[in-house]
Structures are given as C-alpha cells and as structure tokens.
C-alpha cells in the first residue's frame, strides 16, 4: 500500500506542475514521474531475514519479492531471493542509482560482502504539456494518412491517442507516446534522458500543429483572407 501511495505522490507532483503550465497555456519542459531499473546481487538473498532486519514487507502467499522503501527518497525496491532487484519510483536517473546504492547498504547488513551488479535502466516515464488542447481526431486522421499504422485512438475505450515516436521519424528512439486532448503528453519506454528529450523536442512541434486554439485561429485568418478577396479589400 505504501508503494502505491508513493507512486501516486510522484504522479501528483508532476500533475501539479503540468496544471500550472496548462493554466498559463504555456508549453512545458518534460518532467520525469518514474524511473525503473533492474540489477542483480552476486549471491542469493535471504529475504525473510532481510525483511526482519531492515523492516521491509513480505507476503510470500501473494508475491515472491520483499518490498522496501529506500532511504529518504520516494523510490521503492523489490528484492527477490534469487538476488534480482527492481527499483521504481525515482524521479531522476541520479536518484535511481542512489536508491540502488542505498539498497545495497541494507543488504550488506545480512550479507556484508555482497555486490550489486548489472544495474540497467529499463524504463523512464515522463510527461509534458504541449501548450493547449489537442484535436486528437485531426491528429489521428493525419497519422493514418501518413501511414502510421501503429497509432491507436478509441475514445470510447480510452481517452488518449497512442503511437510510437519512431513511426514519425526513424531517427527517434523506440519509445511510446500517449497524447491527451487536454494537452498532456506521456512518453514512456526510454532508457536515457537524452532519448526522452530528443523525442519531446521532435513531437512537440508535430503536436503543436493540432492545438485546437491554433487551428481555430488559423481557420479564422483564412476565412478573413477569403472575405477580403471577395470584397476586394
């Protein structure tokens, strides 16, 4: 339960930041809401003893891993008896690696010589605000015309439009994008911050073309020009 509350807190922090940009109708930078990494200890772990010593949570009838809050950060860790660990909830790569180091300190209390190996970032989840509300129907129609077949939009089932960044530009990372009509955008699947930033730098320009306010203004200008031509003014 505490891990869920923590993740909700991280998401809440990002949502409040996006809400501030949305109120000003101002495009935001990209904010990280969750980083996930896996790693291995170089020995099997007595997770029952670890939970007893370090005040973790373990219920083997429902889940095979012990759960720990790591240090003072918002990160959480799962420790399996095989030695595998999963860290989640960090809001930066630096915090993620710090969480793994802090977890090793806990494990060293019962396994003094254990070392953490093969730390690998598996997923970075981030969000941003494009600067206005998005016409998802127009965006979806445009993606279909461009032959982007992996785009998915079924508003009766889910309010977001999904597509892969790589389908827009082959040079982009293999990450997934989720756009909502209020203007919020979620980028997931990145392994580095440069992948996230590269994706946002590209797609924000594409999505900006479908901001409702911009399209209304554009249509108004075209209508005015047409009227001027017809009246000869």
Residue ranges with predicted function:
Residues 1-184, 190-233:
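Intrinsically disordered, low-complexity polar/charged tails and linkers
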């Amino acid at each position: 339960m505490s891990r869920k509350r923590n993740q909700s807190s991280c998401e809440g922090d990002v949502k409040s930041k996006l809400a501030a940009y949305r109120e000003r109708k101002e495009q935001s930078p990209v904010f990280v809401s969750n980083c996930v990494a896996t790693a291995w200890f170089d020995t099997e772990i007595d997770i029952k003893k670890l939970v007893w010593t370090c005040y973790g949570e373990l219920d083997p009838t429902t889940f095979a891993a012990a759960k720990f809050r790591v240090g003072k950060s918002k990160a959480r860790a799962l420790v399996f008896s095989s030695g595998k660990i999963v860290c989640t909830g960090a809001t930066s790569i630096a915090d993620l690696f710090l969480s793994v180091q802090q977890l090793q300190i806990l494990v060293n209390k019962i396994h003094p010589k254990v070392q953490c190996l093969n730390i690998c970032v598996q997923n970075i989840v981030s969000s941003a605000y494009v600067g206005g509300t998005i016409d998802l129907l127009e965006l979806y129609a445009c993606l279909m015309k461009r032959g982007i077949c992996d785009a998915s939009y079924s508003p009766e089932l889910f309010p977001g439009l999904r597509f892969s960044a790589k389908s827009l530009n082959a040079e982009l990372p293999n990450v997934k994008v989720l756009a909502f009509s209020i203007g919020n955008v979620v980028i997931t699947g990145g392994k580095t911050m440069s992948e996230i930033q590269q994706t946002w730098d590209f797609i924000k320009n594409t999505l900006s073309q479908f901001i409702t306010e911009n399209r209304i203004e554009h249509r108004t200008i075209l209508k005015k020009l047409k009227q001027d031509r017809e009246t000869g003014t």
